C-alpha cells in the first residue's frame, strides 16, 4: 500500500509539495516526504553509479578478450595509472595501454565497488520504503479537513426517522430474546467472548443470506475467503499500525512434515477485504474485464486495542464476527472508480432501507482516514434505545494505493506500455452481522418482542417468521428493581435503628420519680 514514487520526483512530473499538503491535511508527519525525497535521490545516484560500474565491468571483459586474442603480453605488474582508477569514467582508450594483468586488477576494483554500491542501494531502498509506507494516499477534494471526527464529520444525508426513542438498548434486548450468552463466552474465549443463541443464530443467517442474494443480483462474484493470511501477503494489504492494534498472529509449523521445526507466521483476517485485495495479486486486468465485483463472506477477528471500556457489554463491539463485504476492482480512468464508489454506498443504503433501519451518511474527516483511503463514507444507523448513531458501514475508495504494492496492473503488459498502470480498488461493508442485529433489535422492539423485518421473514424458521418474543426480563429492569429493594431495605433499617435510639435516650433520662 504505497503511492507512486514518481509523484515525489520533479524530473518525472511529480510535485512533492502536493504530498506534503496531503500529509498536513491528514495531520500526519510532513517530514516523511522530505526524508523520502532525500533517500530516493541517493538511491537514484547509487543506481546510476551501479549502471556505470556494470558498463566498466563489461568493458574490462571485452578489453581482456581482445588482448588475449591478439596474444599481447599478459604482464606481471598490476600497478594502475591514476586515470584507470576512476572506475565510472573508464573508456576503451583508458584500458587500451594497460596489460591484461592491469585490466584484471581494474575489474577486481570494479567488482568491489559494485558490491559496496549494491549494499548502499539496498539500504537506501529499505529506508525509502519505510517512509513511503507511512505516507497516506492523496485525498479527494470533497473530504472534510479536520482532525476532530466527533465535531467535523460532515453529514451528507439521512434516511428514515432518526429521532425515535425506544425503551431498551441492544445490551438488554439480546438477553430478553435469550439470544446471547456473555458470561460463558468470556469464560471460554476471554473478554468480549460470546455465544450467539437460538433466534439470533437464525437472524444472523437470515441477514447473511439476504445480503448475499442482493449482491448476487448485482453481478457480484461470491467468495468465501480464508480466515488467515501469510505474513508477507498481509504486509501488502494492511498498514503497520494494524499489526499492533488489530491483527491476531497465528504461529504454526512450517510444513506438515513431522521433523520440520521451522515456524510459519500467519495473521487472522480483520475483514474479507484483506484476502480479496490479494485475490488478483500479480495479475494484469484488461479494461473490458472491469469493473470486477466481489462479495466476500468471512468470519473476522479484531483485537480492538484502544477500545478498552467501550461497548464492553453485548455484541456490538466483539473480537469475532461475521461480515459480508463489497470489494471492487475498477478502471483508473475517467472517474470510473468514483462512479463505483457512489454505486457501492448506494447498494448498502438500499439494503438498510429495505430492512427499515434509519441512518445517516457521514463524510469522514481527513485526520481519521487510514493511509489507503482517498475518501470514506460511513453509514451510521440510528439506535433508538441507545439514543445514538452507530457505524454499520464504511465505504472507501483507495484508488491505486493498494494495487501498487499488490502489483495488480491495468491494461496491457509493460512491454506494450511506457509505464505500468494500476487498477483502483474499493471496499464497502454490506453487513457486519452482530452490529446489524443490534440495530434491528433496537428499531423493531415492541412490548412483546422483536418484529422480524419483512425481507428476512423468508429466511426465518416456523415460529420466528413474524416476531422474536421476549422470554427473559430486561437486565436493566432487574438492576433497577434490586436498587429499589436495597434502598427500601436500607430505609426500613434506618427507621428501626432510629426507634431503638429514641428508647435508649428515654431510659437514660428517666429519674427515680419517673420510675
Swiss-Prot record:
InterPro entries: aa-tRNA-synt_IIb, aa-tRNA-synth_II, aa-tRNA-synth_II/BPL/LPL, Ser-tRNA-ligase_type_1, Ser-tRNA-synth_1_N, SerRS_1_N_sf, SerRS_core, tRNA-bd_arm. ATP binds at residues 302-304, 318-321, 391-394. Residues 479-507 have a biased composition (Basic and acidic residues). Keywords: Aminoacyl-tRNA synthetase, ATP-binding, Cytoplasm, DNA-binding, Ligase, Nucleotide-binding, Nucleus, Protein biosynthesis. L-serine binds at residues 271, 302, 325, 427. Disruption phenotype: Morpholino knockdown causes aberrant angiogenesis with excessive intersegmental vessel branching, due to excessive expression of vegfa. A motif (Nuclear localization signal) lies at residues 482-494. It catalyses: tRNA(Ser) + L-serine + ATP = L-seryl-tRNA(Ser) + AMP + diphosphate + H(+); tRNA(Sec) + L-serine + ATP = L-seryl-tRNA(Sec) + AMP + diphosphate + H(+). GO terms for biological process: angiogenesis; branching involved in blood vessel morphogenesis; cerebellum vasculature development; cytoplasmic translation; negative regulation of angiogenesis; negative regulation of sprouting angiogenesis; negative regulation of transcription by RNA polymerase II; negative regulation of vascular endothelial growth factor production. The record marks 429 as: Important for serine binding. Residues 475-515 are annotated as: Disordered. Residues 9-61 are annotated as: Interaction with tRNA. It is found in: Cytoplasm; Nucleus. PROSITE patterns: AA_TRNA_LIGASE_II. GO terms for molecular function: ATP binding; RNA polymerase II cis-regulatory region sequence-specific DNA binding; serine-tRNA ligase activity; tRNA binding. Belongs to the class-II aminoacyl-tRNA synthetase family. Type-1 seryl-tRNA synthetase subfamily. Catalyzes the attachment of serine to tRNA(Ser) in a two-step reaction: serine is first activated by ATP to form Ser-AMP and then transferred to the acceptor end of tRNA(Ser). Is probably also able to aminoacylate tRNA(Sec) with serine, to form the misacylated tRNA L-seryl-tRNA(Sec), which will be further converted into selenocysteinyl-tRNA(Sec). In the nucleus, binds to the vegfa core promoter and prevents myc binding and transcriptional activation by myc. Thereby inhibits the production of vegfa and sprouting angiogenesis mediated by vegfa. This is Serine--tRNA ligase, cytoplasmic. It comes from Danio rerio (Zebrafish). The lineage of its organism: Eukaryota, Metazoa, Chordata, Craniata, Vertebrata. The gene is sars1.
